[in-house]
Amino acid sequence: MSDILRELLCVSEKAANIARACRQQEALFQLLIEEKKEGEKNKKFAVDFKTLADVLVQEVIKQNMENKFPGLEKNIFGEESNEFTNDWGEKITLRLCSTEEETAELLSKVLNGNKVASEALARVVHQDVAFTDPTLDSTEINVPQDILGIWVDPIDSTYQYIKGSADIKSNQGIFPCGLQCVTILIGVYDIQTGVPLMGVINQPFVSRDPNTLRWKGQCYWGLSYMGTNMHSLQLTISRRNGSETHTGNTGSEAAFSPSFSAVISTSEKETIKAALSRVCGDRIFGAAGAGYKSLCVVQGLVDIYIFSEDTTFKWDSCAAHAILRAMGGGIVDLKECLERNPETGLDLPQLVYHVENEGAAGVDRWANKGGLIAYRSRKRLETFLSLLVQNLAPAETHT
């Protein structure tokens, strides 16, 4: 299992290289945007985009995993279709070929004969990427490969990726929008139980060199299986344990701290915003991208990511859910939380990843229908939910 996670870290870095390469030239980037077909549109946005970068990343992840772990590819699922129609009306199925030259030739068809762009992309796609992590390298965990399913969101926050804002200032470490909100999400789950087991979140655009204007990224991972919990922030947390501001909000003093912080979507319902302002005061942050908002919880920048609508999907939440599980947290169904009586001692309604929504079509089959709350500390979540319910209008807790 740690071999699979190691490989996922490598392919996520290769994916990040592709995402960065596609942003290097504005002229090239204009070629890479194709509006999504009606059945594939995410209804939250009036206009949604499918990019060649999206599809390339998804195919690179699929085919690299297939090469290293034959059979696993049939359980890799994602948002993107790998079919393109070029300006000449040709329908092309995009795949990773065995050589750089063949991939460049196929990409050239998608890009209407643009050889320079095609060759540049093929070079990045076929580049070997090494990734080492001392914590992971010292671990060996075995799990049957045939119980694993993988959700991939090749480029989450596509709108921010296309817009490409590079000079957005953060608010207490949280970016409201811009390239920093773009993430590559890979979540591994148990296909029998739907429980998330491993997660990788790669943030391709973290800091930009002022001289070269090239971007550097950051990668986060977590593993939670059969009582073993590990994550990439362990070293950061242990270094900070001596101070009052350590990451992680664990321990009794954190559980009873009266102040909460939350990250939300700018499109969040006014009723939720009003209740949150009574619970969190001015510690509410708006940010783009479900993956990025979840990452803010992973990083300990906020206690909670809350979203009341049904426009996030399994590929948006699985990676962060696995990392948060490894940290003692999770992602739960908001609607079920609001309807639950905490006095009955029922388990928190964790999201699961193996079951379609009954009666739904298209991408809605995999929507997180009840909304979600991502958290790092169960005690903090219980206290937060109690306060949220008290501050919501009575009707809102049952909608």
Curated annotation (Swiss-Prot):
Residues at which Mg(2+) 2 binds: D153, D316
Residues that bind 1D-myo-inositol 1,4-bisphosphate: D156, S157, T158, S267, K269, G289, A290, K293, T311
Catalysed reactions, as listed in the record: 1D-myo-inositol 1,4-bisphosphate + H2O = 1D-myo-inositol 4-phosphate + phosphate; 1D-myo-inositol 1,3,4-trisphosphate + H2O = 1D-myo-inositol 3,4-bisphosphate + phosphate
Binding site for Mg(2+) 1: E79, D153, I155
Pathway named in the protein's UniProt entry: Signal transduction; phosphatidylinositol signaling pathway
Enzyme Commission number(s): 3.1.3.57
Cysteine pairs bridged by disulfides in the record: none
GO biological process, one term: signal transduction
Residue numbers of Phosphoserine PTMs: S317
Entry GO terms, CC: cytosol
GO molecular function, one term: metal ion binding
SUPFAM superfamilies given in the database record: Carbohydrate phosphatase
Activity regulation field: Inhibited by Li(+).
Cofactor: Mg(2+)
Pfam families: Inositol_P
Protein residues bound to Li(+): D54, E80
Family: Belongs to the inositol monophosphatase superfamily.
Quaternary context: Monomer.
Protein name: Inositol polyphosphate 1-phosphatase
Organism, as annotated: Homo sapiens (Human)
Lineage, highest ranks first: Eukaryota, Metazoa, Chordata, Craniata, Vertebrata
